[in-house]
Regions:
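Ribokinase/PfkB-type carbohydrate-kinase core domain
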Residues: 2-7, 60-63, 68-72, 87-223, ...
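Substrate-binding N-lobe of the ribokinase-like
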Residues: 5-6, 17-82, 86-90, 97-101, ...
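Short polar catalytic/cofactor-binding loops
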Residues: 10-15
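A generic structural signal for short
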Residues: 19-21, 45-46, 122-123, 149-150, ...
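Short glycine-enriched, charge-decorated loop/helix-capping segments at active-site entrances
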Residues: 20-24, 186, 230
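Short secondary-structure capping/turn micro-motifs that flank functional sites
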Residues: 51-52, 77-78, 154, 179, ...
Length: 295
């Protein structure tokens, strides 16, 4: 039994592109993938269909050294897919309904297991079955909760999101999502501080794409980080998930917030030079593991 483990709850799915290409992803899956590469051995809790795509996800996890005992198999609903369309170079996403990850089953409490952090997004809250499973998981949780907001119309409701934000200590969202969820103040920093106070958070992080990220804390900190100028960007898919994975590392290892933010930006900047949301080459992670003493 691993105690003080990071639990990651939510969707594992495939993005289907117009050319027929299928790319494994889902924000929680991507985060768990990075954490595994960083020697954190996360507990990934999700559900896939009894189908070929589900088999691919399970095998990919096994090949990466990830535990699969909490990857459930649904006999009725398919492995999650997202139809990606490209219009004038901009991607659009059709997140299909009634996917296996909507039906994550509540599990029997394991009284010996202790999670240091539970990470989850907001997409997995769209269905009552998965939401109830998450409620059961967090009800007995004594550590921290990290929510990675992902507002995808029509799959979110403001009041539901607010209820979950009130249960969290750390929250990450992007600048557009902040505008949807927080009353606008004179400055972004003021808006962030109001949001932090309203939901009783310890840390609020706002990502701003190519402009980097900002954080405010209950301790009064305000931090900005920016990416380097000369990045050879392959694509930005999964940059936020890479950022979140390192934020979780910072929580787990007690890094100062400034250092955590700098390291998260550094890793996200490295990831966008690669195609796709995950990297299947451990040598990509080695410089970070060595520099951050993660062995």
């Amino acid at each position: 039994m691993i105690n003080n483990q990071i639990a990651v709850f939510g969707e594992a799915l495939f993005d289907r592109f117009p050319d027929g290409q299928q790319i494994l992803g889902g924000a929680p899956f991507n985060v768990a993938w990075h954490l595994q590469a960083f020697n954190q051995h996360p507990c990934f809790i999700s559900r896939v269909g009894n189908d070929a795509l589900g088999d691919k996800i399970r095998q990919a996890m096994l090949d990466w050294g990830m535990a699969v005992e909490n990857l459930q198999t649904d006999p009725d609903y398919p492995t999650g897919t997202v139809q990606v369309t490209i219009n004038n170079g901009d991607p659009g996403y059709d997140i299909l309904a009634e996917q296996a990850y909507d039906f994550i089953a509540a599990q029997q409490p394991d009284v010996d297991r202790r999670y240091s952090v539970i990470y989850h997004g907001t997409l997995a809250l769209r269905n009552r079955t998965s939401e109830q499973a998450l409620r059961n998981l967090t009800a007995r949780h004594q550590g921290k909760v990290f929510i990675d907001v992902n507002l995808r119309a029509p799959w979110w409701h403001k009041e539901t999101v607010y209820q979950w934000l009130d249960k969290a200590q750390w929250v990450k969202l992007n600048d557009d999502e902040l505008m949807h969820l927080a009353p606008q103040q004179n400055t972004v920093q003021d808006t962030m501080r109001l949001f932090l106070a309203r939901h009783g958070l310890e840390v609020l992080l706002v990502t701003c794409g190519s402009r980097g990220a900002m954080a405010v804390s209950q301790a009064g900190e305000y931090i900005e980080v920016v990416p380097v100028d000369d990045l050879a960007i392959a694509d930005t898919v999964g940059a936020g998930d890479a950022f979140a994975a390192v934020l979780l590392l910072g929580m787990q290892h007690g890094w100062p917030l400034q250092l955590t933010m700098e390291r998260a930006q550094s890793f996200a900047s490295a990831l966008v030079t690669k195609r796709g949301a995950t990297v299947q080459d451990l040598s990509f992670y080695r410089p970070f593991i060595d520099a951050w003493n993660l062995d």
